[in-house]
Amino acid sequence: MIGSARKQKAFFFVMCALGFFAILSSTMSKNPVLKPFATSLGTPNDLLGIVASASTIPGILISLPAASLSDIFGRKKVLLFAAFVFASAPFLYLGVDSWWTLALVRFYHGFATAVFVPVAEASIAEIFPTKRGERISIFNSATAVGRALAPFLGGYILFVTYPSYFSHYVAVGIAGVTAFVIALIFLAEKRNLSQAHYPTGWSASKMFSGWLLLIRNAGILGISFVQAVQYYVFGSVEFFLVGYLTEVVGLDIFSVGIIIGSQIVALIIVRPLIGRVSDRIGRTTPIIAGIIASCFLVGAFPFTTQFPLLLLLAVGYGVSFATVLSSTSPMVCELVPATLVGASMGFLATMMDVGQTLGPIISGVIFATSLQYLGLFFSLSVLLIASIVVFMLSNRKRFNVLEK
């Protein structure tokens, strides 16, 4: 493991830079280009959802296995694999000529984020055991900056070069290759992010037994449920709040952008600050406080049409969302031994993807009822309340596998 403070700082800086370019690249590949590109290929309307969701499937399928393998073979090899996918996938879009080949490329591209994020977080958690909340939060804020810049940069390139998509995906590729070069130069040096924790006689059965320990740990299950609910709600708000602001409130697109953007900015700025606080006071209080605040803020959206209040609610929700996320990842790796740090992060990432995938789908069904936006946002508040109950009950029953 990286030893000196100087090397630790260098590693952390490189991981943030790697995360920025990697997520910038992957987000540019879909926002705002994916829908017009898919439409230009003659994709039927009923298949657009398949193309859009193809990249989320790997997150559900392989985050846990990939992160578990990083526990066994070390983080370096797994991170290099993810960086290679980030670099190679963008250029495959240049050969796409049908909706199904686009879906396949999206599926392949999804492996990059599914592998990279949990393994990177596991590496940071190991290297900064007393500053996990702060460091993981800063890393995630760096990736969030890349995610926030992508639509603007991608939109500008698309505006200048439309109707051609060649230049756009070349730009996506440049960002991906930059991430790969950063990873290759740094990770190729003779420094090990994490030694393999399993003995030489490792077998698949031992990895599966580790997974069994995770799902038997009440604390892990409680935190994972909270994470799933947080992204279920976030995915739903991200999609349906725009509709509420335009259809019900009657705001123009620019005003909508200010409200949605302020939520993201609040998330980016506040998350590291709350992460530092959680390192000092513990994880439980920020998680519960953040969920309670989210419950009231989300539930209040359909009761106002005033721009200043909607802006305040959006900023408040961004802060409360950041408050919860700043503590979930650090807490989950503190409940497991060193052999399962990666696996615990992978399990958390899997639950996150499940929540973010199901959120818009189930919320869409609720929205289709006569209650529409009122029923939708109320259902999100109820689910947040349920997550508090589950978390508090699991907090009482949890046991630390380190003591077993």
Segments from the language model and where they lie:
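Helix-breaking motifs and short loop linkers at transmembrane-helix boundaries and internal kinks
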Residues: G74, G95-W100, P129, Y162, ...
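Juxtamembrane intracellular "pre-TM" segments in multi-pass secondary transporters
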Residues: M1-K9, R191-G222
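Structural signature of the two symmetry-related core transmembrane helices
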Residues: K77-F91, T285-A300
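Cytoplasmic helix-loop-helix junction between adjacent transmembrane helices
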Residues: V105-A144, M331
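Residue-level signature of mid-helix packing/kink "hotspots" within the transmembrane helices
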Residues: T56-L64, R147-A148, I264-P272, Q356-T357
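Paired small-residue
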Residues: W100-Y108, P308-G316
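Helix-loop boundary and gating motifs at the non-cytosolic
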Residues: Q8-G49, T56, G222, Y231-L245
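Symmetry-related core transmembrane helices of the 12-TM Major Facilitator Superfamily/SLC fold
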Residues: H168-L184, L376-M392
